[in-house]
Amino acid sequence: MFGFEQLPKEFDPRQKWPQCKSLNMIWDQGGCGSCWAFGAASAMSDRMCIHSKENEMQVHVSPENLLSCCFSCGFGCNGGFPGAAWSYWHRKGLVTGGLYGTNDGCQPYVIKPCEHHVNGTRGPCEEGGRTPKCHHFCENKQYNTKYNEDLTYGQKAYSVPQNEKDIMVELMTNGPTEGAFTVYSDFPNYKSGVYQHVAGSALGGHAIRILGWGEENGTPYWLVANSWNYDWGDNGTFKILRGSNHCGIEGGVVAGLPRYH
């Protein structure tokens, strides 16, 4: 068992598992409320690598496949449940699939990137996009593996207790998790520092991938990857106050472990 004394002051999985390239990847959910699928699929991809022999398994678990085919997960582009995403991976499996416009994996993402609360060349995001159709075949015609042979699975799915230390041990031992928090109107314009909600109304829940933790000027934080592309926030990531369930960030942490054939 770890005591708080044994836990490092800061932890970044990109330094502990440098071979796992997915840890550096920031996705773009586009004009679709699919954050729940991205938080899950990106952490699943990280864990597929972290738990593989010599970190050799470099795959992107497909958010597209999860978003379009997990009917028990909620409402597709209108929101979903992180815990259900992990149990779907365990029960049904998910194929591979990378970013929009790539030939990466069986089912790459089909919703195009857009600007999330920042000015740029991609055009502003419009919420409430249509959920893509579920297909049990590889949409990427240049991919040579059959759908059923491409499926990756979780061996189990679980919730992490709402406890700072338990979450830290989970991140350090098994890799990034999915989490969720309440977004207030003072969050979307975040650029740097440790986010703490001060003012503004609640805009809704948002699921993300928790990477690690640290301290900035004495303030403890979680290091989190968002799915709003690299030009949002701090190169696509943000820091949020750690240790007081700020905006509910510690209350909905879910994860799972990969299964290898």
Regions found by a protein language model. Give the residues of each.
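Catalytic-core signature of thiol
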Residues: 1-261
